[in-house]
A protein has these predicted regions:
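N-terminal glycine-/charge-rich "phosphate-binding" loop or analogous flexible N-terminal tail
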Residues: 1-40
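Short acidic low-complexity segments
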Residues: 28-39, 50-53, 172-187
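Phosphate/diphosphate ligand-binding glycine-rich loop within oxidoreductases
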Residues: 41-115
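C-terminal helix-to-coil terminal segments
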Residues: 87-99, 113, 253-309
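Glycine-rich NAD(P)-binding loop of Rossmann-like domains
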Residues: 114-147
Length: 309
């Protein structure tokens, strides 16, 4: 059997080279140049086109090259005989932590304000805050979220974490479910979203939620664009309740040039770069899962189709 690489808007070349290096006896093919669709039982995917996996009748394992799998589950009909695997790697988690720490520091030390003042040659000091002054609340404390929460707590931030189900994380006050959401939001200075996309979490970040963050608070979205009601964020920012937001993910990517988010003075935009898969690190997991698949052994980091993560 062979491995198929099925990517949209991502070059497969380095992946092909890396997999061939680690699996020299395995044929690695790139869609649409597949010799025999019946021979493919393992696919490496990034944003596969709508319904495309149905072309592979013997496909057993669908492996994401990112931590999220919604880019697969939203466009494909997954069979009960198929297993979806996500990519979990400490490098990915650490990259996310570093990005979020930089984003928090930019906000509490007023670096963007000073950059704006520089344009007008305005020499004016701003009041800053320290780590111990700030409560950071994290929506989504799975593998990456829990890693980030522990790291930030170790630096002295007051950290809260929320998930659909209760989690225990060292140094973190944790909350779960709808009943504890308001308690989780109470006292929040910086709200960070790292949730997976599920029917329960789509549009969860709305006017009602953002209005419960402390006045002058800040919002960072590194989860998915589907979590955020963009119009509500703009309204809360315009009201003055929130001081700003940093958005790394969007419902439509790339973000359309005419989108109002581009021109909002209180919104910082980054092009989905908070943490990027390291191919060498990812290859070890893919190779291990492929070999486990061939040998009938359990696969790592499989998706629960009922939970969606």
């Amino acid at each position: 059997m062979s491995i198929a690489i099925i990517f949209t808007n991502k070059s497969p070349d380095t992946w092909v080279e890396t997999l061939k290096k680690h699996l020299p006896e395995t044929e690695v093919e790139v869609y649409p140049d597949i010799k025999n669709f019946n021979e493919i039982d393992f696919a490496l995917c990034w944003k596969p086109e709508n319904g495309i996996l149905a072309k592979f009748p013997n496909l057993k394992v669908i492996h994401s090259v990112g931590a999220a799998v919604d880019h697969i589950t939203k466009t494909q009909k997954i069979k009960e005989t198929q297993t979806i695997c996500s990519f979990v790697d400490e490098n990915l988690s650490n990259d996310m932590f570093e990005f979020l720490l930089a984003s928090i520091l930019n906000q509490i030390k007023n670096l963007s304000v000073y950059q704006s003042q520089k344009k007008h040659q305005n020499w004016q000091t701003q009041t800053y805050k320290t780590f111990k002054d700030i409560t950071v609340s994290i929506l989504g404390v799975g593998n990456i979220g829990a890693f980030v929460a522990e790291k930030l707590a170790a630096l002295g931030f007051k950290i809260k974490g929320w998930a659909l189900n209760k989690k225990e994380i060292a140094g973190v006050s944790t909350f779960a479910g709808d009943k504890e959401l308001s308690q989780f939001l109470n006292g929040t200075d910086i709200l960070i979203n790292i949730l997976p996309v599920t029917p329960q979490t789509e549009n969860i970040i709305n006017n009602h939620m953002l209005s419960q963050v402390n006045e002058g608070g800040y919002f960072i979205n590194v989860g998915r664009g589907e979590h955020l009601v963009e119009e509500d964020l703009i309204a809360v920012l315009n009201s003055g309740h929130l001081s700003g937001a940093l958005l790394d993910v969007f419902k439509t990517e790339p973000l359309p040039t005419e989108h109002p988010l581009w021109n909002h003075p209180k919104i910082m935009i980054t092009p989905h770069i908070a943490s990027i898969t390291n191919i060498e690190s990812a290859a070890f997991l893919v190779v291990e899962n492929y070999q486990n698949h061939l040998n009938g052994l359990p696969l790592k980091h499989t998706l629960s189709l009922t939970k969606g993560y």
